[in-house]
Amino acid sequence: MKRNLCLALIVLAATLGGCAANKPGNDPSLIGSWKGVRSENGKCQFLSWKNNFKPDGTFNITFFRDAQQTQPIQTEHGIWKAANGKNELRTAGVPLPDTYTYTLIDADTVHYVSVAKDPSGDCQEDYEFTEHRIRG
């Protein structure tokens, strides 16, 4: 009986491991550090930011009051999922995710359009922005 149970557990573990291995990952072209700004003349309050999309599906983002990024406002972290031109950010402590469509302009430039956001977010307007990869 013990042997059958052990064998069943091994088969189950192998099956689940195989499913995890086939799980689609995040778009690898977004992994890394990026910076962006919200237009000063746009629909929402001006912000600039630096974010880091990690391969393990976590992110952190620091918001700044100024374009030079010397006056931090706050840092947030959470999990991200991106595939097929859709990026979803689930910030820790925020009930609903922010969702964007994205288009890669080149390896170091990505354009986003906001399509869904948590009602507690600082801007409830639809807006778009471009981020640039931070190298070095």
PLM features: what roles do these ranges have?
Residues 8-15:
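Bacterial N-terminal signal peptides
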Residues 78-82:
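Predominantly extracellular/secreted and cell-surface proteins with exposed
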Residues 19-75, 86-136:
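Lipid interaction determinants
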Residues 1-6:
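Bacterial N-terminal signal peptides that target proteins for export
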